[in-house]
Amino acid sequence: MSAARILSRCVWPSTLLLSAAAFAAAPTPLQEAATGLPGARSLYMELHQSPELSAHEVQTAAKLAGRLRALGYTVTEQVGGTGIVAILQNGAGPVVMLRTELDALPVEEKTGLAFASKVRVRNDAGEEVAVAHACGHDLHMAALVTTAEVMAHTRGTWHGTLMLVGQPAEETISGASAMLKDGLLTRFARPDVVLALHVGNGLPAGQVGVVSGLYNTNADSLRITIYGKGGHGSAPHTAIDPIVIAARTILALQTIASREVKPGEFVVITVGTVRAGTKNNIIPDEAVLGLTVRTQTT
């Protein structure tokens, strides 16, 4: 699927806040959206090639802030770290908030695309990692900026306040709370409506999926540290092997969903990282598991 086709289904419906009498105005928001698609595609590719890790989205935030200021938005940077808030006031009316993520993931891109990410950085633990936009946040940002352009260019068709939020550190589940603690809902306009989207491959290009009721899940991140007793790999009877315990724990965790949760209730438990040991003939003192848990109820 081409970047242009993907973007065509992800630019926010720009008919938000439209008054019925304004439909005769030219150009219409949808016409503006079509005009802005080439620029959206270009921005998407630019962002895709320059991803930044969670809480380090300095250049990404600056790029979005600059574009939004150029459109006439009042922009505040460094909200909750590297977050941004952009406001466009257009008379009396509801406050509508649109939100995008800013961060990328510590994964290596192997798509072979001409605009594939080749970025490598050191993470907070000092490890060198590849970085890529593997969760669509680059596309979400391009959609947000294009929507900002459409709404700024068609002010005669709507009334109210548009509030755009660039959320940092979404992947580490810390950016939203940081922005709230920094006064997102008290320093700025309090939204009447909050809208967000997520790109996916579950629908054909050109279609937008809308779900009534609950859709996405709550995400919790857990770390389990298993303490053992190190020793030589040739004498496991003198040690307490945390790797063996970790292996048993990983398998046991999967029985929570199948045996502890009521059938029909949604839960996913995934062990995404296993860290232990430094050499193949040494039993380490500990093993660390990194988990994500997804639920729809508390």
Each predicted region: which residue ranges?
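Histidine/acidic-residue-rich, glycine-tolerant segments that coordinate divalent metal ions
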Residues: 120-132, 138-139, 151-285
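Bacterial N-terminal signal peptides
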Residues: 9-21
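Acidic/His- and Gly-rich active-site-bordering loop/insert found
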Residues: 25-133, 138-160
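Residue-level signal for inorganic ion chemistry
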Residues: 47, 179, 291
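N-terminal secretory signal peptides that target proteins for export/translocation
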Residues: 1-7
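A conserved active-site cap/scaffold subdomain adjacent to cofactor or substrate pockets
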Residues: 280-298
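Short coil/turn motifs at secondary-structure junctions
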Residues: 103-105, 229, 296-297
